[in-house]
Design a protein with these regions (language model features):
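Central hydrophobic cores of alpha-helical transmembrane segments
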Residues: 140-149
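Alpha-helical transmembrane segments of multi-pass membrane proteins predominantly involved
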Residues: 125, 129, 183-217
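Juxtamembrane non-transmembrane "cap" segments at the membrane-aqueous interface
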Residues: 2-4, 152-173
Length: 229
């Protein structure tokens, strides 16, 4: 071990994390994210491209990819809610397996549960109205915001309420929790000051995307080439 840069962790086997690919539920989650990304991309095109033929194809793509997304997403969520979770004893910091831990987290954190349900409803509303109403092109706003809320709530369920967010399968007590993996007090204070800039960053992102998406892309614009903002 180097005294200047000591090794504070190591892989439990020679796979260096690649063995996560052998976990079918990791693959199922990855497929859910993949098809959701395709749905969001198609919704964005519908909102920003003025071409009936292309938007009609995008609407069909939304429907087809939504079916596959829901298949994998529901399977992952249901399995997560009924499986054992990696709980942390708040007094001893001991990590242990608790039945229905993530379902319990939802019950014990009702605000997170509400965020999750709102997110799911927004995702389904944006997709459903886009598919059923041919003139509706704002689905990306509902589905996009719903995706953010849903992902945020799942992350909170996986890491809050005395839960190990990065479990170790070779040594349960080496699992990462918010308590044993947070930065030093100095770093946390520094990042707290840096976070003051977040509203300005968000404002810039909003301004930039609003400028880009102010007018829908047309076939004529694509034929002319060049750049216009």
């Amino acid at each position: 071990t180097d005294t200047i840069m000591p090794v504070i962790s190591h892989w439990g086997n020679g796979w260096h994390g690649l063995d996560a690919l052998t976990n079918i539920w990791n693959v199922i989650l990855g497929l859910a994210v993949f098809f959701l990304a395709r749905v969001l991309g198609a919704l964005y095109f519908i909102n920003n491209i003025d071409d009936k033929e292309l938007t009609d194809k995008c609407r069909r793509a939304v429907l087809n990819n939504t079916v596959l997304f829901l298949l994998f997403f529901l399977a992952f969520v249901i399995r997560t809610l009924v499986s054992d979770g990696f709980a942390v004893n708040p007094d001893t910091q001991e990590v242990y397996m608790q039945p229905f831990k993530y379902f319990t987290n939802f019950i014990e954190m009702p605000v997170v549960l509400i965020l999750f349900l709102i997110g799911v409803v927004l995702v389904l509303f944006g997709i459903g109205k886009t598919v059923l109403k041919k003139t509706f092109d704002k689905g990306i706003w509902f589905t996009g915001i719903g995706t953010v809320l849903t992902v945020l709530s799942l992350l909170l369920v996986a890491g809050y309420n005395n839960t190990a967010y990065y479990p170790s399968y070779t040594d349960l007590q080496s699992s990462l929790t918010l308590a044993n993996s947070c930065s030093s007090e100095f770093t946390l204070k520094t990042m707290a000051y840096v976070s003051i800039l977040v509203p300005f960053v968000l404002a810039y992102i909003f301004y930039a995307w609003r400028s880009i998406d102010r007018h829908k892309i047309t076939e004529k614009e694509m034929d002319e080439g060049g750049h216009s903002y």
